[in-house]
């Protein structure tokens, strides 16, 4: 059994000795593998080379001494532009490239023109001398700012104006501005409405026709009365307040040239509504013309900031019946009352902040009447020929306790037994002075009777 296991032990020892000798004799440098050992289908994971695996002894990653440094093939010029801001010039440019380079190197003839255009568009163009440059620069001096750009002058020419006319128009506009500033805002609209009158009405001397549309927009305004300068109206106003003369003087100062073409215009506050003070003779009348019938005047009343008080009765147009110019007091109802608001009967009487009319809105026969009656004299409005409304008459009666009561005469039955001439004879002439919206009356018989503080307080309590 032992012979079968080691038949020749000495032979094995000999083979081992021979292999060791061969290894010692082998060269130290790398030896090329045989061509049959390389397999191109194999790839090494360490060096990523084909022909051997990672466990092969031919891998340079396992034997560092045998690893070969990859050769340096040199830099490739012309592929990488290290300095893009400097174009690379070829050593031997071709004929086409040479011509192209010469064209680019040549200065362009349009460069100075382009520079000029850029300079013009980047900044303001130089100012060209214009024929009206002096006037335009003077007018735009106030627009110049130290840090802002200069104004651009257009080529549009302004119309040449006579220096005398321009100076006169400038002074006229300044005077008009001062006059309008001095007047109340309610009178400004009235002045503008008076300037819109037609030339035909001014020449014929007819009463001024104020359109209803103007009354809608204007609201509370003073009443304007147009009087022809060459003739006096038949039923004109007896007394003209000082405010009207002052306004007339201001209008003459504003428009000195227009005096020959249009008549004088006087403005006076019309009687306010039934809740405010009304002066004696404060109503102005329109004189009838020679050719045309005088239309019904439109009275725009001033609205004061006081608390409005509505009267206990309203007078429709159908209930208004006849009246004559000789009546104690004639009032023409405005035809545009339906547009301005509810129709209220205009009341007349003297009422200042310290005195109040006791029964100015009471119906007739409210208190016993005395045989003596006094009525304030007012200017008479002529009845309109085309309008069915007729003048109203208000009668003031003196009561036993010293108070006054007013009654509206709308029917012939309410006429007093005395004649209208008696009222006119008894009524004193009162000169009034209007200062702004408040109307003050100098002492008179009617003024003394109404100036009772107790009666004013009682009248306020009765009205409330």
UniProtKB/Swiss-Prot annotation:
Region (Disordered) location: 1-43, 71-294, 312-386, 412-437, 445-464
Biased composition (Basic and acidic residues): 74-83, 97-114
Similarity comment text for this entry: Belongs to the FAM90 family.
Name this polypeptide is given: Protein FAM90A1
Superkingdom of source: Eukaryota
UniProt biased composition (Polar residues): 344-355
Organism: Homo sapiens (Human)
Composition bias type Low complexity, residue spans: 180-197
Matches recorded under InterPro entries: FAM90 (IPR039213), Znf-CCHC_6 (IPR041670)
């Amino acid at each position: 059994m032992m012979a079968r296991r080691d038949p020749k032990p000495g032979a094995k020892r000999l083979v081992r000795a021979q292999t060791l000798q061969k290894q010692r004799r082998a060269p130290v440098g790398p030896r090329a593998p045989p061509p049959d050992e390389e397999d191109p289908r194999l790839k090494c994971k360490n060096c990523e080379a084909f022909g051997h695996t990672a466990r092969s002894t031919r891998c340079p990653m396992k034997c560092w001494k045998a690893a070969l440094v990859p050769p340096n093939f040199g830099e490739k010029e012309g592929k990488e532009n290290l300095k893009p801001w400097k174009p690379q010039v070829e050593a031997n440019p071709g004929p086409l490239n040479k011509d192209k380079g010469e064209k680019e190197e040549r200065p362009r003839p349009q460069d100075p023109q382009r520079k000029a255009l850029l300079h013009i568009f980047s900044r303001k163009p130089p100012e060209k001398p214009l024929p009206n440059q002096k006037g335009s620069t003077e007018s735009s001096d106030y627009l110049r700012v130290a840090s802002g750009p200069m104004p651009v002058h257009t080529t549009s020419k302004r119309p040449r104006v006579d220096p005398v006319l321009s100076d006169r128009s400038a002074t006229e506009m300044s005077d008009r501005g001062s006059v309008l500033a001095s007047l109340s805002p309610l009178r400004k609209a009235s002045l503008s409405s008076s300037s819109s009158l037609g030339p035909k009405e001014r020449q014929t001397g007819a009463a001024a026709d104020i359109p209803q549309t103007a009354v809608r927009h204007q609201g509370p305004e003073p009443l304007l009365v147009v009087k022809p300068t060459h003739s006096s109206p038949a039923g004109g106003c007896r007394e003209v307040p000082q405010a009207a003369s002052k306004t007339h003087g201001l209008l003459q100062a504003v428009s000195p040239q227009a005096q020959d073409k249009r008549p004088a215009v006087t403005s006076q506050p019309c009687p306010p509504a039934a809740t405010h003070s009304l002066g004696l003779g404060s109503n102005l009348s329109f004189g009838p013309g020679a050719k045309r019938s005088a239309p019904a005047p439109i009275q725009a009343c001033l609205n004061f900031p006081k608390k409005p008080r509505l009267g206990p009765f309203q007078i429709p147009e159908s209930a208004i019946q006849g009246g004559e110019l000789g009546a104690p007091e004639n009032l023409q109802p405005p035809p545009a009352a339906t547009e301005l608001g509810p129709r209220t009967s205009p009341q007349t009487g003297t009422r200042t902040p310290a005195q109040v009319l006791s029964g100015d809105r009471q119906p007739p026969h409210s208190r016993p009447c005395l045989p003596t009656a006094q009525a304030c004299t007012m200017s008479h409005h002529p009845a309109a020929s085309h309008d069915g409304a007729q003048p109203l008459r208000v009668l003031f009666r003196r009561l036993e306790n010293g108070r006054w009561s007013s009654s509206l005469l709308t029917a012939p039955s309410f006429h007093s037994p005395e004649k209208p001439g008696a009222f006119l004879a008894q009524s004193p002439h009162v000169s009034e002075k209007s200062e702004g919206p408040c109307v003050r009356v100098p002492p008179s018989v009617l003024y003394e009777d109404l100036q009772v503080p107790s009666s004013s307080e009682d009248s306020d309590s009765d009205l409330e």
